[in-house]
Every structure is written in structure tokens, then in C-alpha cells.
A protein has these predicted regions:
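Sec-dependent bacterial lipoprotein signal peptides
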Residues: 1-18
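Long, intrinsically disordered, low-complexity segments
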Residues: 19-20, 101-104, 181, 272-336, ...
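Membrane-proximal, proline-rich intrinsically disordered regions
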Residues: 20-63, 358-360, 582-594
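Short, surface-exposed recognition loops and adjoining beta-strand edges that mediate ligand/DNA contacts
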Residues: 61-77, 154-159, 193-212, 225-323, ...
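Short coil/turn linking the two alpha-helices of tandem helical-hairpin repeats
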Residues: 145-146, 152, 217-229, 472-473
């Protein structure tokens, strides 16, 4: 299927250039009901490509509003380098995380209403296309239910014929009903989808993608049942007695993937940090960690993640956006399994002087080294040079207001070429992001070619571990977690509990757009984020008169990042339903607090 690797195909054929002025996107479908569309395989492929492209998967291009306001910037993973944008608000904003995907659902339902009569396809092909469309629809309902709780369940393309519009004004289903629909759909289509794909069909759904969606969705449902509260007569929240069944369903779906033998943790590189880095860059079919991937290439759909996240001295224009916090860096253990706190002071509390500042990160979890650009680490043939200031021989500290400020009659800048400063674009924490970034060249706007693994095998193992530990099967949870730790290159655990499983998920899946949803489904976001002052790691050059700068040492200080603490209001566990959805359908009840 040509160009499905970028999920767009021949969009001009099925552009659906119509606007919604009705209840649940009941737009005209004359074009899509045209027999010429369903008698042309190219047109069907184009339509299918559009459904994939519209599917909400929160990939590298998913951000809030504009200019790289990524989900991680609203969590404990990172802060935003820029001083503008809603990601900086002390009060985490409402409504910006929403996705009311009924136009996308309608497009799928229209496809499903017609595909089984498509003359251009064999009966066997029709079943596969039907299953793919239902997979896309289940993904979209998952995107909505994790945001809003229960939403109206629409499985046919609604058509307004000029009669009573009330027949189209469907109320919200209960939250558990949407999760059950996703589970039932995934189970129904699994046998209809092929076990594997190759060639130009590589990026289309397989039965294991359906298992992975079922696994993730059931994990979320179980979490809501156990840790959330039921309100609005079940429109939000899930009865607690349903939790065990959902944990078991998540575990069973994971087992189907694990026991298939078709997937494995990526181990192509000998160096553990390099291996973790290239896990996200190796697009070959030999990368068996990929279960379902969305592809990007500059010929059809280039990415912007590199452009917005390049360190200061490596950027083209925008850059620097995602700054991992020192708190988050400390979450990565050392290779021997010891606590990950950075060793900036000796046992007496005095600053340690480092001749090589990268030694501060010696023996850290290789996943940290593969995910985060830290002070003075190598990058794109140079180094990421981060310095907050200079300590004079008399012990006083000099800091800069700009990157060009020089130290007392020398040519040495007070801050290094990549920061840190309290203003401008440079890092506010001492760190930049490395995961997903192109290591060998600077990438311009919409020229990124890093693919997005919607589902990868390590997530399945972590889902499995979480379900097992919640069901009391710590032996299996420990086994799954230690497979991941072994690949990472850190010491195995000898026992496991719920918090340790969550910790493993936090560091393994960092910056992959899981953390925001995880802390919401566990209902701990307010505990983690409210009044939390995130920290920065600031390197200082210890000045010695008469020495070359390259011979001087560094100390590090863990200091407050120049960002306000945040507040996560309890109502944010569910999103505000868009006002236009309610104004056109009085049967839709708004979520509490809005």
C-alpha cells in the first residue's frame, strides 16, 4: 500500500473538505458514498491512509497549542526552557489536553459502512481493511476515554436528513462501557488482522498491535477502578469491583504478545547507553521491539522534534525547549542499583571538584545517558557545554546575564555556549533531551525522520509487570522488570513492589508521552506536582589564575530551577468537554469542576 508508512496516502481523493455544523460531526458524505471511491483500490488505500493519519497516537508532533509545549513539560520529567507558553503557568491550564475526535470517528464509521461492499477488494481484503478501521476507531475512543471518561459511543455514520435532530443527540456512555467497547473491538479484530507486516505495509496494524492496545487500555481501566472515584452516575470513574477483571485482561493481552516470540528487547549495540539511544532511531525490520510504529519522512510527513529541542549551540532557530529536571535525572539509579542522587558533595558536605565534569554521571543508568544530554557530554561532533558561572579565587560567584558576558578581562565567557541562564532560550535546568534526537546532523523544521513507536515491547513488559503486581503475582512482575533492567545494564532487583514497578516505568518510558497519563490514572498528579519546586544542576568553573580553562575544575550545585511551582487541580483528572459539543447536544453532561 503506497505511502501508508506516513499514513497520508492520496489525501486529495478523500479530503473530506466539509465542516461540521451538527451534533457528533454529522457532515455530508456524498463524496465517500460515491461508488467510484469504493470501486478503486487506490482511493480505498488513500482513505485508509487518512484514517491512520488522523488516529490520535500522541507522537513526537503532539504538543499543546504551539512551539513544542510537550506533555513532559507538564509533568515531573521536564520544564519548558522558554519563558512564554501555557506550559509555564503555575496553575496547570484546563482544556489544553483535550481531543474530541468525533470527526475522525465519523470518517471511520463511513468507511466501515461501505467497505464490505467495496468491489475493488476481495472478501479477504475487505475483512483486513475493516479490522484496520476498527483498530483506528478503538484507538480514538481510547484517546477520548482517558481524557473525558465516558463519551457518546457512535458506531455508525450519523446522517441528518432534516428530521428531528434529537435522535442524533446521544448521551455519554459510562466510562467502563467505553473501555469494554475497546476491549471487545480489539478481541474481535485480532483474528482478522495479519500476524506481521513487511515492505510498504510495515506500518499498518497487526493483531499484535490490537493486543497492545487492549493491554494498555485495560491497564488504564483497572487503574481508574482502583484509584479513582465514581461520579456522575458512572460517566466518570469505574466501580472498584471491576479492577481485578481489568488487571487480568491487561495481563492476558500482554501474555499473547510475550508468548508469541515475535518481539524482543532491542540489543543491537554493545554499549548500553548507545543501545538505548538507537532503540528509537533504528527503523529496520531487525528492530524487534517495534510492535506498531508511525513513520516520518521528509517526502511526506517530516517531524519538528529535533528543531524544537536542539541544544542552544546546535539549533537553527527555535530549540532548547525540553529541559529534564535534576529531580528526574536523580530518578535514574546507578548501574549497581544504588540510589541515583547525583554526587555533588562529599561525605562532609563539601563540593566535589571534578577535573572532568562528565565524571559526575559515571556509572549512571545507561538509559539516562541515552535519554538526556548532560553537561559536557559529546553531541554531534562537539560537546554540550553547560556552565552557570565562575567561582573566583576568593570564593565569590560570578554569573552572567547573557551568553556573551566575559569574565574579568578574559576571553572566557561566564556562562558556556549552551547555558545556563535564567532568561532567553537556553536550558533552565542544565539538561537537554537526547531521546529521539538525530545524533549526526542538525535538523531543520519539518525535516525530522525519527519514527514513533506507538507500542513497543518494553511497554508491554511493564504493563504486564504492573498488572501482575496489582494481582499479587510479584514473581512474574519481578521477572518482567528484570528483563528490562538487564537490557538497560543495571543490577537486577531481588524483590519488587508496586512503587518499584512504577519507578521502572518512569525511567524506561521517559519522554514517550506516558508520564502525564500515568500520574493521572494513578491519581497522584496533585501529590507529585503541587507546590513542587523543581531543581536544576548548575556547573560552576573554579577559576585558578595562571591556568588554562581546560585545566580548571568544576563543582556542581543543585539549585532551584527558575520556574514557578505548579498546581494540578483535582478536576484535571478529567478534561473539560468542549463547549461546542455541549451547545449542540444538551444530552452531554459536563465533567465536574468546569
Amino acid at each position: 500500500m503506497k505511502n501508508l508508512k506516513s499514513y497520508i496516502g492520496l489525501v486529495c481523493i478523500v479530503a473530506l473538505a466539509v465542516s461540521c455544523n451538527n451534533v457528533l460531526d454529522t457532515s455530508p458524505t456524498n463524496l465517500l458514498n460515491d461508488n467510484h471511491v469504493w470501486s478503486s483500490k487506490n482511493a480505498i488505500d488513500a482513505y485508509m491512509g487518512q484514517l491512520y493519519d488522523e488516529m490520535q497516537v500522541e507522537d513526537l508532533e503532539y504538543h499543546i497549542e504551539s512551539e513544542g509545549q510537550y506533555l513532559s513539560e507538564f509533568t515531573d520529567e521536564a520544564v519548558r526552557s522558554y519563558t512564554w507558553g501555557r506550559a509555564n503557568y503555575a496553575l496547570i491550564p484546563e482544556g489544553v489536553f483535550g481531543w474530541w475526535g468525533y470527526q475522525e470517528v465519523r470518517n471511520i464509521n463511513t468507511f466501515l459502512d461501505n467497505i464490505n461492499n467495496a468491489a475493488a477488494l476481495t472478501p479477504e481484503e475487505r475483512k483486513v481493511y475493516e479490522a484496520e478501521a476498527r483498530f483506528c476507531r478503538a484507538m480514538n475512543y481510547f484517546a477520548m476515554v482517558k481524557r473525558y471518561g465516558g463519551v457518546p459511543l457512535v458506531t455508525v455514520a450519523q446522517k441528518y436528513d432534516g428530521g428531528d435532530v434529537k435522535t442524533l443527540q446521544l448521551p455519554r456512555n459510562k466510562e467502563y462501557e467505553i473501555y469494554d467497547f475497546i476491549k471487545d473491538e480489539c478481541q474481535a479484530i485480532q483474528s482478522m488482522l495479519p500476524e506481521s507486516r513487511e515492505g510498504e505495509d510495515l506500518y499498518r496494524a497487526t493483531r499484535y498491535a490490537a493486543y497492545a492496545l487492549e493491554c494498555r487500555a485495560m491497564l488504564y481501566a483497572a487503574s481508574e477502578a482502583k484509584y479513582g472515584n465514581v461520579d456522575l452516575n458512572g460517566l466518570i470513574g469505574i466501580p472498584a469491583e471491576k479492577a481485578e477483571g481489568y488487571w487480568k485482561a491487561a495481563r492476558a493481552a500482554a501474555e499473547k504478545i510475550i508468548n508469541s516470540g515475535k518481539y524482543a528487547l532491542y540489543t543491537a549495540k554493545t554499549d548500553k547507553a548507545e543501545n538505548f539511544q538507537y532503540l528509537f532511531l533504528d527503523e529496520s525490520e531487525a528492530n524487534k521491539e517495534q510492535i506498531f510504529t508511525k513513520a516520518f519522512d521528509t517526502s511526506n510527513k517530516g517531524g519538528t522534534f529535533d528543531y524544537f529541542n536542539a541544544p542552544q549551540s546546535f539549533k537553527l532557530d527555535y530549540g532548547c525547549v525540553t529541559n529534564p529536571t535534576e529531580d528526574f535525572v536523580a530518578e535514574f539509579e546507578y548501574k549497581d542499583g544504588s540510589d541515583g542522587a547525583l554526587k555533588v558533595n562529599d561525605a562532609s558536605g563539601n563540593p566535589i571538584k571534578y577535573a572532568d565534569p562528565t565524571d559526575l554521571f559515571k556509572d549512571k543508568d545507561p538509559r539516562m545517558l541515552g535519554s538526556i544530554l548532560y553537561p559536557f557530554c559529546p553531541w554531534q561532533g562537539s560537546r554540550v557545554e553547560v556552565r552557570k558561572g565562575i567561582i573566583k579565587p576568593d570564593g565569590t560567584i560570578v554569573t552572567a546575564s547573557s551568553l556573551s558576558d566575559k569574565y574579568e578581562g578574559t576571553n572566557t565567557t561566564i556562562a558556556a555556549k549552551d547555558g545556563t541562564l535564567t532568561s532567553t532560550d537556553v536550558t533552565k535546568t542544565g539538561f537537554y533531551i537526547k531521546k529521539f534526537m538525530t545524533p549526526n546532523k542538525v535538523v531543520d523544521y519539518e525535516k525530522g525522520e525519527t519514527n514513533w513507536m506507538v507500542f513497543r515491547y518494553a511497554e508491554v513488559l511493564l504493563n504486564y509487570a504492573e498488572a501482575c503486581v496489582e494481582l499479587g503475582d510479584n514473581v512474574e512482575a519481578l521477572r518482567a522488570v528484570n528483563l528490562i533492567r538487564e537490557r538497560a545494564g543495571i543490577a537486577p532487583r531481588t524483590s519488587i513492589n508496586r512503587d518499584q514497578v512504577r519507578h521502572e516505568r518512569k525511567v524506561e518510558l521517559a519522554f514517550e508521552n506516558h508520564r502525564w497519563w500515568d500520574i493521572r490514572r494513578w491519581h497522584i498528579a496533585d501529590q507529585l506536582l503541587n507546590a513542587k519546586q523543581f531543581k536544576a544542576l548548575n556547573p560552576y568553573l573554579v577559576w585558578e589564575d595562571g591556568k588554562d580553562v581546560s585545566q580548571m575544575k568544576y563543582i556542581f550545585k543543585i539549585e532551584d530551577a527558575p520556574k514557578d511551582p505548579r498546581t494540578f487541580l483535582p478536576k484535571l483528572y478529567y478534561e473539560r468537554i468542549p463547549a461546542d459539543a455541549i451547545s449542540t447536544n444538551p444530552n452531554i453532561i459536563q465533567n465536574p469542576g468546569y
